[in-house]
Amino acid sequence: MIIAVDGMGGDFAPELVVEGCIQAVKEYEGIHIIITGKKELIKNELDKREYNGNKIEILNSEEVISTNEAPVKAIRRKKDSSMVKALELVKEGKAQAVISAGSTGALMAGATFVLGRIKGINRVCLAPLLPGAKAPFMIADAGANVDCKAEYLVQFAMMGKVYFESVLGVKSPTVGLVNIGAEEEKGNELTKAAYKLLKDTDFNFIGNIEPRDIPRGEVNIAVCDGFIGNTVLKTYEGVASNLFSMLKKEIMASTRGKIGGALLKPVFKDFKKKFDYTEYGGSPFLGAKGICIKAHGSSDAKAFKNAIRQAKICYDKKIIEEIENNLGNLIENNI
């Protein structure tokens, strides 16, 4: 399997991108990586480390898409950017997956306009996996589509279901519709229409769920439009980040707190690990005609290595074909 990695995307590129790629080819069998970006910078990082030159190569590109550029314009105008070059490798069949920690908006535009959508899929969906109290959960969509139709939400649920079953090995994952109340009649026109459609599928649909229920692990796949999903995601990230900061501040405020903190250090370490985004790799763009993984902007080498592992599993489990098959089932049932 060949994986295209945007070598210039992310806060710590290309150094930690390169390190993550080297770790990945050492740990995972059957992968070859093409790093796109400024050849001199990437080669300089490679030369600092021991690596298998038969498993990693560089594709030179002189441009970089920054996070403050208009996404669609950047994808269309910067044809020699590291992100576009990586996407084109997948489009041309020269790679089977693309990974980038660059601009989310630009990668979304690239997944749509360079890779294209799977035939029959209305919108590509950003679907991050996050740690919950009971088990990891997915938000679909987490920001790719702020305006949606009910049919889109059903497709998001289907693609999330495929991911859980194929990639994570979870049989019959639960699907919940994010809403302001649990009752069927709650919500706006979109959620009411989506509820009716989801109820008619063979998904393990548990009905409406409130945002507070999501991190409890009450549902595997939280379905919503991208506006709601991104709000839930950013709130979750903010609360998690501030929780650790507040806890640390309280522990360091007194001698008693410091002693207690020292005794509970292993517990805190395990607890923090559960909230470590690097464990999950990245967020897949589901519905694109190619495996596309968005790594976190602040990804370290471990996060890139795990994103590569994630892409490999998606490829091995034939996630694109599984989405196509499940889409056919929806169409047969007029949903």
Swiss-Prot record:
Role of this protein: Catalyzes the reversible formation of acyl-phosphate (acyl-PO(4)) from acyl-[acyl-carrier-protein] (acyl-ACP). This enzyme utilizes acyl-ACP as fatty acyl donor, but not acyl-CoA.
Known EC number: 2.3.1.274
HAMAP family for the chain: PlsX
InterPro entries reported in the protein's UniProt record: FA_synthesis, Phospholipid_synth_PlsX-like
Coiled coil: none
Catalytic activity: a fatty acyl-[ACP] + phosphate = an acyl phosphate + holo-[ACP]
PANTHER family found in the cross-reference section: FATTY ACID/PHOSPHOLIPID SYNTHESIS PROTEIN PLSX, PHOSPHATE ACYLTRANSFERASE
Enzyme class: transferase
Subunit structure, interactors included: Homodimer. Probably interacts with PlsY.
GO biological process, one term: phospholipid biosynthetic process
Subcellular location(s) of the protein: Cytoplasm
Family stated for the protein in its record: Belongs to the PlsX family.
Any one Gene Ontology molecular-function term assigned to this protein's record: phosphate:acyl-[acyl carrier protein] acyltransferase activity
Pathway assigned in UniProt: Lipid metabolism; phospholipid metabolism
Primary location recorded for the protein, binned into one broad class: cytoplasm
A single GO cellular-component term on record: cytoplasm
UniProt KW Phosphoprotein keyword: no
Keywords per UniProt: Cytoplasm, Lipid biosynthesis, Lipid metabolism, Phospholipid biosynthesis, Phospholipid metabolism, Transferase
Protein name: Phosphate acyltransferase
